Amino acid sequence: MDAKKFLTGGVAGGVTMFFLGFLIYSVLLDSFMRANGAAAAMKVEPDFPYLVLSQMAWGAVVTLILGHWAGVSTLAGGLRAGAILGALLGLAIDFELFATMNTMNLQATLVDIVAQVVRFSITGGVVGYVIGMGGRR
């Protein structure tokens, strides 16, 4: 994968992660997560520069794994690989946090894993599509 595909895939993935995160966590799951998590640990407003940086980094991670290592270059391939990546990352990160911190109860932890599968699957689809665009004429 060349630098242009990595950059465009990474940016597209980061933007997708950012907006899906807003939709899932701030719109759909806000009251549920506040009721089942440590509300005192949440900031009233997130530090957006760091949030954007985080989502761009996730976009780069998805692009590197799917585009460079797995050779994904289609929407369908990205959706599949992204779902697997989201499930593995969600399980690993959420259960580690559940085991070591008091930030969410088990119900919220399980819901968050499902949310990560959705986020990474759609992001993987976008990244796969964007990477594959260069091959079409």
Language-model features, listed with the residues they occupy:
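Juxtamembrane/disordered regions of integral membrane proteins
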Residues: 1-137
